[in-house]
Structure formats: structure tokens, C-alpha cells
Amino acid sequence: MKYRGFGRTGWMVSEIGFGGWQIGGAWGPVDDDVSVYTLLHAFERGINFVDTAQLYGAGHSEKIIGRALREWNGDKIYVATKAQPTVWPNASDNAPAFRGRFPDWHLRENVENSLRHLGVERLDLFQLHTWAPNGHLELDWLETLNDLRREGKIDQIGVSLRDNRPGEGVDLAHLGLVSSQQVIFNLFEQQPRDALFGAAKASDTAIIARVPLDS
């Protein structure tokens, strides 16, 4: 397995990560024991980065990952999870309002739920599950997340960009307000190369590629 630095966090993460959407049961029943076995096999093969979200099976994916972490006796596994907004922005809206989608009470509730599901004392990477081009101008969400960092409940902060809208993360990357951005990038979706990747490199913001094998 090859590893690379995860932005400015100091982490060395596997170039291949484990996506936790399917083990949440989004596409039908799954065998939880098989899911745990699969995770442990991935860890044994050198994968040390797992991405999940509370949305994935209403927290079920997080719980399965938590089981695997308790059974794992090897090196550090970094787990990234996400909080969905109180209201999802309209996919066709080019400039959705961002303030109020991640209020303080909502973020704190999500952090506590993820801590409980994963069975950990601190979340490695806590991400917003959507974004908007004006999000860097409405920083109520960041104030709360920085408070949670100071409280020791989360380590790093990230965002997951909306589908096929990598340009919405460029200003955020230039400012370096978060440690990572998650974006669709594969053979068919190359837009992040236009501006986002350069901005992220300049601020040492890590990039997580979504659906890299999309077909």
C-alpha cells in the first residue's frame, strides 16, 4: 500500500480508502459480520482511511466501523464521518443560502451520535455533508466546529462538496479554513483539475476523491 500526507494534518493515509456507504444497507440488507470481516481485511492490507456518514443507514455504517475498530489491534485507522444539514440545498440552486443549515445544536448532536456509534473519544475528521459557494462567508458552522475541537471531540474539519460542483470549494480552499474537501473526481469528472486542485495545493488542503471508479 502507498501512503501520502493528508494535507497539513500530519497524517499519512493510504492512497486507497474504504467507503462506508454500502455497509450501511442503503441498497438492501447486508451481512454485518461480513462487513466487519471486510473492514478488517482492508486494514490488514494497509488501508488506514475510512469514510462514512450518519446518513449511511441512519448511523449503521458508523456502528459497523466501530465494531471493526474494537476488533483491530494494529496501527491507527483514521475515520472520517459527516453530518447532513437540517435542510438539503436544492440541487438546481446555484447560490443556496448556507447559514442555518448546520446550527450549533445540530452539529453538537451529530458529533455526539458519531462518537457513540464509533465508540471513540474523538472524531478524526468531521465533515459537513454538503456545501454552498457562500459557505465561507457564513461561518456559524465553523465557530461551532472549532469549539468542538477545543473541547477535544473532533480533530480535523472538512466539507463534502455538492455533486459535480467543484468550483464551489475554490474560495474555501484558498482561505484554508478546513483541513479537507471531498469532491467527485474520476475518469469522467475532471473539473476539479481546473481550479480546485490548485487552490487546495496552495493552502495544503487535503482532497478526498469521491467515486474514483465511477462508470
Task: Please place each PLM-identified region on the residue numbering.
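N-terminal binding-site loop/beta-alpha segment at the start of enzyme catalytic domains
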Residues: M1-I77
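Acidic (Asp/Glu)-rich catalytic clusters
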Residues: G7-G10, E44, R67-Y78, L115-G119, ...
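Glycine-rich, positively charged active-site loop/lid region within alpha/beta enzyme cores that binds
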Residues: M12, Q22, A26, P89-P96, ...
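Structural preference for beta-strand elements that scaffold enzyme active sites
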Residues: V13-G17, N48-F49, K76-A80, R122-Q127, ...
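Active-site mouth loops of central-metabolism enzymes
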Residues: W21-D33, S92-R108, T130-N134
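Short, acidic/polar
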Residues: P29-A42, R101-L118, R162-L172
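Active-site groove signature of glycoside hydrolases
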Residues: L115-N134
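Beta/alpha (TIM)-barrel catalytic core signal, keyed to glycine-rich beta->alpha loops juxtaposed to Asp/Glu
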Residues: T130-S215
